[in-house]
């Protein structure tokens, strides 16, 4: 089974957590695109979706799924999204696609967070994948200096502007032993919008695509 086939298996497995007549939170990325394809098969049974990115919104609309503004929604039953890394405590690094802030907002509103990945994303310690940090443009250099003080090696992601009009610093060489503490520390830096650690609000269910099928992990 190829990596993309494992992603597809995880994406389709998430459909079992979608209830009829609900609004579904939809993340961003290659694995989520498989989930959106699956969600389209029951588009007449759900109210619609809230999307975390312009890219996912475009795909949802193309497949005939109504997309709601989050401000018009009180509650999202489930939020389905991928991860760049996830540990055994369901802490994640996300944001490789630069949609981390909107992903974090939608996750905060959702009752349950279903994380869908292939088995290459499971790690014992977060940090081998560079940690994305969304930053107000005028604060980029200051935030970079502060991230160095925290032990990281920040690199400006050239040519990338987020859906919110901000920039991304990718922080390399951080072995993140306490994700909750590090998430809070980075978010406290003036000029940071948010960072790609999802630890204070981690996943509730992890669906892992493997060569032998999909493994379901809960805490």
Curated annotation (Swiss-Prot):
Reaction catalysed by this enzyme: aldehydo-D-ribose 5-phosphate = D-ribulose 5-phosphate
Enzyme Commission no: 5.3.1.6
GO cellular component assignments: cytosol
Chain sites annotated for binding substrate: 28-31, 81-84, 94-97, 121
InterPro entries for the chain: NagB/RpiA_transferase-like (IPR037171), Ribose5P_isomerase_typA_subgr (IPR020672), Ribose5P_isomerase_type_A (IPR004788)
GO BP terms, alphabetized: D-ribose metabolic process; pentose-phosphate shunt, non-oxidative branch
Keyword Isomerase attached: yes
Positions of the catalytic residues: 103 (proton acceptor)
Signal peptide: none
A UniProt-annotated Pfam family: Rib_5-P_isom_A
Pathway noted in the entry: Carbohydrate degradation; pentose phosphate pathway; D-ribose 5-phosphate from D-ribulose 5-phosphate (non-oxidative stage): step 1/1
Keywords: Isomerase
Transmembrane segments: none
Coiled coil stretches, renumbered: none
GO molecular function, one term: ribose-5-phosphate isomerase activity
PANTHER family: RIBOSE-5-PHOSPHATE ISOMERASE
HAMAP family linked: Rib_5P_isom_A (MF_00170)
Reported function: Catalyzes the reversible conversion of ribose-5-phosphate to ribulose 5-phosphate.
Similarity comment: Belongs to the ribose 5-phosphate isomerase family.
Description of how the protein assembles with itself and partners: Homodimer.
Record's protein name: Ribose-5-phosphate isomerase A
Taxonomic path: Bacteria, Pseudomonadati, Pseudomonadota, Gammaproteobacteria, Alteromonadales
Name of the coding gene: rpiA
């Amino acid at each position: 089974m190829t990596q993309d086939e494992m992603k597809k298996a995880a994406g389709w497995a998430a459909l079992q957590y979608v209830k009829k007549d609900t609004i579904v939170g939809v993340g961003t990325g290659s694995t989520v695109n498989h989930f959106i394809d699956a969600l389209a098969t029951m588009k007449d049974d759900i109210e619609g979706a809230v999307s975390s990115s312009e890219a996912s919104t475009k795909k949802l609309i193309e497949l005939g799924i109504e997309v709601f503004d989050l401000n018009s929604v009180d509650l999202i039953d489930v939020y389905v999204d991928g991860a760049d890394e996830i540990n055994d405590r369901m802490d994640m690094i996300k944001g490789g696609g630069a949609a981390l802030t909107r992903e974090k907002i939608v996750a905060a509103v959702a009752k349950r967070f279903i994380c869908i990945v292939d088995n290459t994303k499971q790690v014992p310690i977060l940090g081998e994948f560079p940690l994305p940090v969304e930053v107000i443009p005028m604060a980029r250099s200051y935030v970079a200096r502060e991230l160095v003080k925290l032990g990281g090696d920040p690199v400006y992601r050239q040519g990338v502007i987020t859906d919110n009009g901000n920039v991304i610093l990718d922080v390399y060489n951080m072995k993140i032993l306490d994700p909750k503490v590090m998430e809070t520390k980075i978010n406290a830096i003036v000029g940071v919008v948010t960072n790609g650690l999802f630890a204070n609000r981690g996943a509730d269910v992890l669906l892992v695509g493997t060569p032998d099928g999909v493994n379901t992990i809960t805490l």
